[in-house]
Amino acid sequence: MSKAKITAIGTYAPSRRLTNADLEKIVDTSDEWIVQRTGMRERRIADEHQFTSDLCIEAVKNLKSRYKGTLDDVDMILVATTTSDYAFPSTACRVQEYFGWESTGALDINATCAGLTYGLHLANGLITSGLHQKILVIAGETLSKVTDYTDRTTCVLFGDAAGALLVERDEETPGFLASVQGTSGNGGDILYRAGLRNEINGVQLVGSGKMVQNGREVYKWAARTVPGEFERLLHKAGLSSDDLDWFVPHSANLRMIESICEKTPFPIEKTLTSVEHYGNTSSVSIVLALDLAVKAGKLKKDQIVLLFGFGGGLTYTGLLIKWGM
């Protein structure tokens, strides 16, 4: 059976910064309040005419500039996003059109903040099955376009960015060690953006086109769910927390991550996040954290890393990987 590993990374964030001081002028909040509750200091915001596909394309360009091989033989593009430019066509098709790779599949994944880890899980399966050889897994979000800037509990959280990872066949070294998935569809009404249907689980939805979140309930679900799945994932791989070099959870909220780490045997000091300077970027947060660690010289080849994406659905995917770069 073929093996798969991550061989390249690229990221992009818009130049405009929205700081806590800026938010103080928009809603009744303060830098102290935001930092104390979320750990966030700023987030990036796309321009009016800049959309998710534009950010994804820039992230792939960044990856391409750092990758020693060619991307002309990419045979699948997977884009994780909740803020696609259009209902259809997919954002993945817009990325394909820009780069002109005609012999490639292209599809979007809508798993909110778990989108990147779902994409990596699928890429691993497609490659190890022998169906594909080189897959671009991209995460892109322009959450600012669906954020209600009159709601101080949510508008302080979200930012825009994109990231890309290249997953390739490798006959020698497996880069994916184990995975776990789970879904709690009965929690679909605590984090959503309404569409054609105006109710879920018997709950009437707010049809404003903006994100709606019950932050307290999302926090409780994540803090309750992730620690147990963290342990289950290590057990599936026959590893312990002592074998783990880095933990990279979805950067939803630094206080949430601290709460999760308190319930695991893994120290917060070995947890990688992107929340302080990028806010909650949904599916993008994990790849941003990885790239920050690469650039800082923290993340090194063959280190064992646990990725855990969780979010609206409610759904999650955890992956144990061996870093391939």
From Swiss-Prot:
MF term (GO), any: beta-ketoacyl-acyl-carrier-protein synthase III activity
Entry's localization field: Cytoplasm
Top-level taxon of origin: Bacteria
Gene3D superfamilies, sorted: 3.40.47.10
Record's keyword terms, sorted: Acyltransferase, Cytoplasm, Fatty acid biosynthesis, Fatty acid metabolism, Lipid biosynthesis, Lipid metabolism, Multifunctional enzyme, Transferase
CDD domains: KAS_III (cd00830)
Reactions accelerated catalytically: 3-methylbutanoyl-CoA + malonyl-[ACP] + H(+) = 5-methyl-3-oxohexanoyl-[ACP] + CO2 + CoA; 2-methylpropanoyl-CoA + malonyl-[ACP] + H(+) = 4-methyl-3-oxopentanoyl-[ACP] + CO2 + CoA; (2S)-2-methylbutanoyl-CoA + malonyl-[ACP] + H(+) = (4S)-4-methyl-3-oxohexanoyl-[ACP] + CO2 + CoA; malonyl-[ACP] + acetyl-CoA + H(+) = 3-oxobutanoyl-[ACP] + CO2 + CoA
Pfam families in UniProt: ACP_syn_III, ACP_syn_III_C
Active site location: 113, 250, 280
Quaternary structure annotation from Swiss-Prot or TrEMBL: Homodimer.
Protein name (Swiss-Prot/TrEMBL): Beta-ketoacyl-[acyl-carrier-protein] synthase III 2
Organism: Bacillus subtilis (strain 168)
